[in-house]
């Protein structure tokens, strides 16, 4: 769908592109490095490694295993208390290697338990659905594995 708008004497081309079923897509940047990008509020941002993994997780059913321990519980409580956490804070609080923290965040985002937001401090992660988090803690991850999240 294409439309041309006239704004302050200029022509603005608006193109509606349907959501891709095979995300993520990469393009080569000026340094020859392949990057994924996303558009938010009329701005283009380079996708974080977590966002790229989220897109990859949405496209496949075999996902990382979820494990729960006292440190993950501490992380969940911080989100319940309304905290917005940067990636490094999530990894440190949950005592996870960065790759494992990426996997955890991806699962929780795909399962619609947490969401990310781009703020003044960069990307932050926050609780999206407290009841889903409660369900994950009480009933386990099997409740979420069979659902279609894409």
Where are the language model's segments positioned?
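Conserved N-terminal catalytic/coupling substructures associated with nucleotide/phosphate chemistry
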Residues: 1-150
């Amino acid at each position: 769908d294409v439309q041309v708008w006239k704004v302050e004497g200029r022509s603005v081309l608006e193109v509606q592109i349907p959501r891709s079923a095979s995300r993520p897509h990469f393009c080569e940047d000026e340094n020859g490095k392949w990057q994924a990008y996303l558009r938010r509020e009329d701005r283009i941002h380079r996708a974080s490694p977590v966002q790229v993994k989220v897109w990859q997780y949405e496209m496949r059913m075999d996902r990382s295993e979820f494990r729960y321990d006292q440190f993950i519980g501490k992380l969940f409580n911080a989100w319940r208390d309304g905290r917005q956490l940067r990636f490094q804070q999530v990894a440190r609080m949950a005592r996870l290697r960065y790759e494992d923290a990426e996997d955890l965040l991806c699962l929780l985002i795909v399962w619609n338990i947490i969401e990310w937001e781009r703020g003044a401090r960069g990307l932050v992660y926050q609780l999206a659905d407290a009841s889903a988090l409660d369900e994950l803690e009480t009933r386990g991850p099997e409740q979420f594995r069979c659902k279609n999240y894409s």
